[in-house]
């Protein structure tokens, strides 16, 4: 559970950064 919670948050943040970079 501990490994799953932070992993999902990290993925979301990485995706957001990549998506924002592509949008710009």
From Swiss-Prot:
Keywords: Disulfide bond, Growth factor, Heparin-binding. It comes from Oryctolagus cuniculus. This is Heptapoietin A light chain. GO terms for molecular function: growth factor activity; heparin binding. HPTA is an acidic heparin-binding growth factor for hepatocytes. It comes from the Eukaryota. Heterodimer of a heavy and a light chain linked by disulfide bond(s).
């Amino acid at each position: 559970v501990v490994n799953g919670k932070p992993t999902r948050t990290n993925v979301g943040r990485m995706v957001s950064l990549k998506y924002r970079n592509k949008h710009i």
